[in-house]
Curated annotation (Swiss-Prot):
The keyword Mitochondrion does not apply. Glycans are attached at N135. Golgi membrane protein involved in vesicular trafficking. GO terms for cellular component: Golgi membrane. It is a multi-pass membrane protein. InterPro entries: TVP23-like (IPR008564). The chain crosses the membrane at residues 91-111, 113-133, 177-197, 201-221. Keywords: Glycoprotein, Golgi apparatus, Membrane, Transmembrane, Transmembrane helix. The keyword Methyltransferase does not apply. It is found in: Golgi apparatus membrane. It comes from Laccaria bicolor (strain S238N-H82 / ATCC MYA-4686). Belongs to the TVP23 family. This is Golgi apparatus membrane protein TVP23. GO terms for biological process: protein secretion; vesicle-mediated transport.
Amino acid sequence: MAELKKGHRVFSGQLIAVFAVVESSYTLHTTMSVAQPLLDTIEPDEPLESSVNTKGPATAPVVLTPTHATQNDPESGIVGIFRQSAHPTALFFLYLFRIAAIAVYILCGWFTDNYVLSTVAVVVLLAMDFWNCRNVSGRTLVGLRFWNQVDEDGESYWVFESRDPSRPANPIDSKMFWIALYVFPLLWSVLLIVSLLKLGFAFIPIVVLALVFNITNVIGFTYADRDAKQKWATSVAGSAWGMGLGGIGGQILTGAVKKGVGRVFG
């Protein structure tokens, strides 16, 4: 019995010693973890310097949106307009004559004091623009043309020509033509007001002539465009008649189309 108690005491002492060793090891490991963070004990897979390009400057990314275009975009700006145009030559000369007439009128006083030379230059450019717009640019860009004709009885009337509706105009050509047609008369009107305010009565006849030429083209092409739309409406009604909608139904359809076009464009 005494030997059993002695063995039990020896076993208990050994067990206490083992617990003391485990506790001291745990305390040492906890102290190391607090003093040295875990991230410092983990080595990175690759050095950070290898993933950074230090040879060239960083460039800001370009974000393209429907309303944003880069400088190198071939479809942006004046170059893009001429590339999308079906008749770039006609479009070029339309704006060339109009811009040249205004530029010569504004800048002629800076380069020469000869009033006759300045007047002749502006009038020639206005005449060339009037003829080009009515006979070349209008027919080529939007498929419209007009002129005034006198019959045998001495009565004058307007004649309008329009392109076949099955061959519509290029959207860029049409847009740029109508912009030029309506914007430049406004510019000449501003120049007329400036001449009146500055009491430059010597140049008022030139501005008045420019307004006459430009407004004539505006009225002529506006009526030509309306006449073309009315012809298109008539052709649509005629095709409906040919498809079997004759009689009262065809007459009602024809009248409805004509009235609708007249209210919109008349």
